[in-house]
């Protein structure tokens, strides 16, 4: 018997966040097939009347690929330079892939001082609503080329998992679908323990869950499970919902929206 998440059936405005691990192959090359499939699925959803926003990571990972560098540099300025180079190439790829399906896209680069300041936050919200009204799929990334995270001037979100949640809050999205390198939230690391069990639903971010989530992301990205729980907490505080699922099976986005029990569904009990 196929179980259904009935709350999801009524969603209209969707934010999809894709992580670096879903865009960059383990060998550092760009995962072109995943980007193409993402463009197809999101274009199809847009054609069916859904409002879709894409939050993407990957600028630094793509920058590494463009320059043929294997190891992510530690220096902030070097990382910012890579992000600047990679963002141009990343948007070029997205534009090409979405064009195959006659879908127009736009780019927004955000920093925390935009979303934290009321006037600029309202301007960003108005721009996004206008784009959605035109049938455009906005593609959002953090402006890594200028974002810093220092005591006296914090403009960095920390990771794009949090950015996905903040964008969802900004546009009052019905659902955030977070594409990662794992099928969902497990009770233990599934790459180590064969008996690891996936959580079908999570209704509260507890200290126990936070302790269970550990480790950073891949060598190309920064997002680990801890950041995903932090993103879910932001949504919980705003009465919003999220599904965490595997970015290697992008076509399952359609099934998620149809209410199929895929990944881990983060929502508060009604």
From Swiss-Prot:
<dbReference type="GO" id="GO:0004349">
    <property type="term" value="F:glutamate 5-kinase activity"/>
</dbReference>
<dbReference type="GO" id="GO:0005524">
    <property type="term" value="F:ATP binding"/>
</dbReference>
<comment type="function">
    <text>Catalyzes the transfer of a phosphate group to glutamate to form L-glutamate 5-phosphate.</text>
</comment>
<dbReference type="GO" id="GO:0055129">
    <property type="term" value="P:L-proline biosynthetic process"/>
</dbReference>
<keyword id="KW-0418">Kinase</keyword>
<dbReference type="InterPro" id="IPR005715">
    <property type="entry name" value="Glu_5kinase/COase_Synthase"/>
</dbReference>
<dbReference type="GO" id="GO:0005829">
    <property type="term" value="C:cytosol"/>
</dbReference>
<keyword id="KW-0963">Cytoplasm</keyword>
<keyword id="KW-0641">Proline biosynthesis</keyword>
<dbReference type="InterPro" id="IPR001057">
    <property type="entry name" value="Glu/AcGlu_kinase"/>
</dbReference>
<keyword id="KW-0808">Transferase</keyword>
<comment type="pathway">
    <text>Amino-acid biosynthesis; L-proline biosynthesis; L-glutamate 5-semialdehyde from L-glutamate: step 1/2.</text>
</comment>
<dbReference type="InterPro" id="IPR041739">
    <property type="entry name" value="G5K_ProB"/>
</dbReference>
<feature type="binding site">
    <location>
        <position position="160"/>
    </location>
    <ligand>
        <name>substrate</name>
    </ligand>
</feature>
<dbReference type="Pfam" id="PF00696">
    <property type="entry name" value="AA_kinase"/>
</dbReference>
<feature type="binding site">
    <location>
        <begin position="180"/>
        <end position="181"/>
    </location>
    <ligand>
        <name>ATP</name>
    </ligand>
</feature>
<feature type="binding site">
    <location>
        <position position="144"/>
    </location>
    <ligand>
        <name>substrate</name>
    </ligand>
</feature>
<feature type="binding site">
    <location>
        <begin position="222"/>
        <end position="228"/>
    </location>
    <ligand>
        <name>ATP</name>
    </ligand>
</feature>
<comment type="similarity">
    <text>Belongs to the glutamate 5-kinase family.</text>
</comment>
<dbReference type="InterPro" id="IPR036393">
    <property type="entry name" value="AceGlu_kinase-like_sf"/>
</dbReference>
<keyword id="KW-0067">ATP-binding</keyword>
<protein>
    <recommendedName>
        <fullName>Glutamate 5-kinase</fullName>
        <ecNumber>2.7.2.11</ecNumber>
    </recommendedName>
</protein>
<dbReference type="InterPro" id="IPR001048">
    <property type="entry name" value="Asp/Glu/Uridylate_kinase"/>
</dbReference>
<keyword id="KW-0547">Nucleotide-binding</keyword>
<keyword id="KW-0028">Amino-acid biosynthesis</keyword>
<dbReference type="InterPro" id="IPR019797">
    <property type="entry name" value="Glutamate_5-kinase_CS"/>
</dbReference>
<feature type="binding site">
    <location>
        <position position="17"/>
    </location>
    <ligand>
        <name>ATP</name>
    </ligand>
</feature>
<feature type="binding site">
    <location>
        <position position="57"/>
    </location>
    <ligand>
        <name>substrate</name>
    </ligand>
</feature>
<dbReference type="InterPro" id="IPR011529">
    <property type="entry name" value="Glu_5kinase"/>
</dbReference>
């Amino acid at each position: 018997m196929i179980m259904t998440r009935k709350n999801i059936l009524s969603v209209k405005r969707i934010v999809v966040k894709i992580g670096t691990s879903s865009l960059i192959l383990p060998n550092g090359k760009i995962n072109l097939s995943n980007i193409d499939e993402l463009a197809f699925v999101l274009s199809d959803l847009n054609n069916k009347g859904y409002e879709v926003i894409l939050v993407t990571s990957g600028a630094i990972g793509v920058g590494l690929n463009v320059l043929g560098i294997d190891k992510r540099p530690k220096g902030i300025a070097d990382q910012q330079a890579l992000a600047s180079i990679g963002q141009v190439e990343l948007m070029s790829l997205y534009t090409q892939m979405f064009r195959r399906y006659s879908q127009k896209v736009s780019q927004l680069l955000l920093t925390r001082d935009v979303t934290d300041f009321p006037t600029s936050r309202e301007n960003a919200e108005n721009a996004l609503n206008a784009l959605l009204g035109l049938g455009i799929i906005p593609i959002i990334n953090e402006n890594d080329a200028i974002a810093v995270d220092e005591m006296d001037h914090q403009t960095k979100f920390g990771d794009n998992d949090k950015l996905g949640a903040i964008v969802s809050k900004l546009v009052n999205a019905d659902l955030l679908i977070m594409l990662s390198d794992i099928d969902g939230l497990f009770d233990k690391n599934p790459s180590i323990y064969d008996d690891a069990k996936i959580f079908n639903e999570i209704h509260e971010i507890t200290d126990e869950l936070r302790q269970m989530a550990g480790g950073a992301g891949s060598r190309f990205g920064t997002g680990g499970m801890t950041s995903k729980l932090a993103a879910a907490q932001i949504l919980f505080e705003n009465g919003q919902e999220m599904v965490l699922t595997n970015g290697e099976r992008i076509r399952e986005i359609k099934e998620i929206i149809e209410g199929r029990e895929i990944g881990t569904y983060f929502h508060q009990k009604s």
